[in-house]
Amino acid sequence: NSPASISPSNIPCLARACPNSFFNSSKYKIHQKAIASARAGNVIGGGDWSKNRIIPDIIRGIERGEDVIVRNPVSVRPWQFVLEPLGGYLLLGARLNDEPVKFADAWNFGPHTDDVMNVRQVVEQAISIYGKGKYVMPPIIGQPHEAGLLNLDIGKSVSELAWQPKLRTAGAIEYTIDWYKLSAPEYYNFTLGQIQKY
């Protein structure tokens, strides 16, 4: 249990506690407030240049001609393309608008549990799609503990919101790497094309 895996899991509890204390659904007609929380998996997509994030680190390594360093190769994460949770958030917002009391709850948006990859698989696929690059796996010594498996239960979002991820993890990686292979002047139109295609 790492801080990264514990703190996000507390958000649904907090999202339930505050409304129950201050905006209880039984008194919705009085206060007219409905609060929901939404949690996403590990989001990937073009335009993320943050440090210590898997895809930007892969791209920087490839573009600099350096080996990509894979620190936790067997760690499994719920990777998903950025438009997946955004679609879920918009759907949740619409449902909250239509039936605020019913949908004021905690929701998860991520891939199906049978569609997860470990870090090494993501790196290998990204390098393959990019068409060049290499990776190395240094010995794991003195690194902070990180959970080996993180996943989200999206069952409620699937059954009650009728939300489904549209892309498999492999497709999310492909959409993402295709974006990074472009030059800056192409980003805008390509992004619009990805949104329309999605």
Describe the residue ranges of each PLM region.
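Mid/C-terminal beta-alpha module of Rossmann-like enzyme folds, strongest
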Residues: 88, 95-144, 154, 170, ...
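Conserved C-terminal active-site "lid" loop/helix of NAD(P)H-dependent oxidoreductases
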Residues: 82, 105-106, 142-164, 175, ...
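Conserved Rossmann-fold NAD(P)-dependent oxidoreductase catalytic core, especially the SDR/UDP-sugar
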Residues: 1-9
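NAD(P)-dependent short-chain dehydrogenase/reductase
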Residues: 12-97, 115-116, 122-129
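Short, polar/charged, Gly/Pro-enriched helix-capping and turn/loop motifs at alpha-helix termini
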Residues: 25-29, 68, 99, 133-136, ...
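Glycine-rich loop motifs involved in handling phospho/adenylate chemistry
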Residues: 74-77, 142-146, 193-194
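Amphipathic terminal alpha-helices
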Residues: 169-198
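Tryptophan-centric aromatic hotspots in well-structured domains and transmembrane helices
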Residues: 18, 49-50, 79, 107, ...
